């Protein structure tokens, strides 16, 4: 887990070359530009879940879900922008309501401590060519494909 952030940063660097002063919202716009299939004016899960996207990017972390452990790691590494595939504040389940609220508040406190902005990149991430969930699973399972039948 310690190197999860480092492993993905080079992919974002490819997308972001040419931006001189990077604000978090600039990175988000760059990610959105890759998601031509997402209906941005309608229902999408991709959005800022916490924090200020108008701040300058110091370091970016990428994860499946920003757990407390991931956020603590981001604090240690000076990361102020986390791109998370899944929602970081799940509010359904069989947990006692007070424990759930306490857990959410603790996570918000950690994020506030590091002035960390979290962006959920779900719809783009699922289908982005070569790196999206669909393509990665196809490669992992050994499917040989060059063209997409559909661009979902």
PLM features per residue range, with description:
Residues 10-152:
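Hydrophobic structural segments
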Residues 2-4:
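Targeting/processing segments of secretory and organellar proteins
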